Amino acid sequence: RNKDMGRESPADFTFYGGIYRDVTLHIVPAEHFALPANGAPALKVTPIVTDLAAKTAEVTVEAAVVGAQSVTFALEGQALTAPVENGTATAVFTLDHAHLWDGIDDPFLYTVSAKLDNGEEASARFGCRKFEIDPQKGFFLNGRSYPLRGVSRHQDRKDAGIALTNEMMGEDMALILEIGANTIRLAHYQHAQHFYDLCDEKGLVIWAEIPYITMHMTNGRANTLTQMEELIRQNYNHPCIAVWGLSNEITAASAVNEDLLENHRLLNELAHKLDPTRKTTMANVFMLETTSPILEIPDVNSYNLYFGWYLGELEQNDEFFDKYHADYPDRCIGFSEYGADANPQYQSSHPEKGDYTESYQCIYHEHIAKMIADRPWLWATHVWNMFDFAADGRDEGGKHGENQKGLVTFDRKLKKDPFYLYKAYWSKEPFVHLCGSRYVDRAENVTEIKVYSNLPEVSLYKDGQLVETKQGDKVFTFQLPITGKHSIEARSGEHSSVILVNKVDAPNPDYAMDNRKNVTNWFDGELDESCWSVKDNMAAAMADPKAGPILKQISDKAAAARGDVAAAVKDNPALVAMMERAMQRMTIESMLMQAGASEEDIKQLNRVLQGISKE
């Protein structure tokens, strides 16, 4: 591992190699538009909306030139000729009644062209728009409230790795647009130019960031600065980009020391020097204390929280943001990552944290989606992740080498049920979706039927007969007796969705991980209350001189299954403190189930704990 390369820091996704994007050869005459070594385009366009009410914009165009004496620029019927001074020609246009780039509603793009006397030409697309972020009101686009609600995306795919074709990128964009998202966090590195182009064309507001991840490397400063310069210079003209990301979870495996702080100060200063028109941000790991000085460096802040999945309870997400907002009313705060892994093969009538069921992923996102909707002051929120992605350090949830937090599977063939939850919240396209299409065999006599829809009323039918009509908001649940094979249909107006269910005598073992197939009750007999058991509070048991070391050994083993990042962060003092706070609320059983422990492992631990008296 090269300690001078920021991209080589540990991270919870697969690092691919090779040349996986287009390579072009440029043959140019003596007089030509420059090809900068940092990969920047020849034209740099800076549109500033100077009067939002009148829609007046000032557009500055700079051309990098070699050998020529002048450049003629053209924009919307206006032509300006400018001399070349020190390799650059500059023209300033005024657009009256400019057609604004207005997000997904109207992503209008202008094209400016430049021409040399020898006929050489260059052009660039751009958009006129105004971004504002208010700590009390959230994100604004062109003067109107425009809460950024969307997803994060890694640019890999099953059987293609990171070498996505333009067609594949178009398919990704279509899926993101289907749920009605208006923002994408492009994690955790620079993405293909074609995808930025798609975001310009479709109106998605973008968070773009460099691969400065998890662990600060003392010798990596120069590389992080180079990465930031290349990111900004190459993507400066894209109207979709609203913020530059300085780092991701950089304190997960690093202490907040002066070297780390100085690295971020320099990145922040560089970003503003290269681009005074955009804000800076960073995604902070959940255990970073809100009093940390690193939060004072970027213009706006954001946190990655996983309460209700990796640790703690769902309600802690609400509590965290409400407290932060109350404690720091002058700071802008966003929700840069949240999610729960789900293998769509796994289904349950009683889903729980750590079971990797699609059923629990629904419960998780139902809570978070409502929490977000109730807090418009969250300037941006991004589901982690739109798609399952490769994470070679992981071995969990029935799959090796995948992070399964996506709303869509790694091969893009299956939309998990929470995909439709966000469609219900964000999309204007009317629809009805019945959840649980993969939960066919059901052992319960009365089963829960869940419907996601953005329509106000849904009717449920069993075998063609009306069961019940409900009014609701996004999520509709019905309790339905079942006796055999049934066709279940949800209808709202002309929209409908159908699934099949089959009453069985016992749970289908294929719906649970191998280590949980026969779980009904962990224990056959009574527990001795004078001794420790997995039903006891985790923090209390950890404090016991005999039970504590046993539990620590097990928790370390569970962390290792989460991959390279989990192994790196386990000794982080801030994480230890966060885990201790979480343990105040949780039983040993709950912690183990969340970590994916098997039935036999939990039973065996309980036998051991039942042999240790409480002192």
Predicted regions and their residues:
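Short alpha-helical basic/polar micro-motif
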Residues: 21, 108, 366, 379, ...
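A short, amphipathic alpha-helical segment
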Residues: 24, 423, 427, 606-614
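Substrate-binding/catalytic cleft of secreted carbohydrate-active enzymes
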Residues: 60, 173-176, 183-414, 418-425, ...
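Short amphipathic alpha-helical segments with coiled-coil-like heptad repeat character
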Residues: 30-38, 118-119, 369-370, 389, ...
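Secreted/periplasmic carbohydrate-active enzymes, especially glycoside hydrolases
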Residues: 1-186, 203-206, 227, 237-243, ...
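Intrinsically disordered, low-complexity coil segments
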Residues: 29-55, 396-399, 413, 556-580
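Compact, charge-rich alpha-helical regulatory domains located at protein termini
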Residues: 522-614
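Flexible, active-site-adjacent loop/turn segments at secondary-structure boundaries
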Residues: 11-18, 29-31, 41, 99, ...
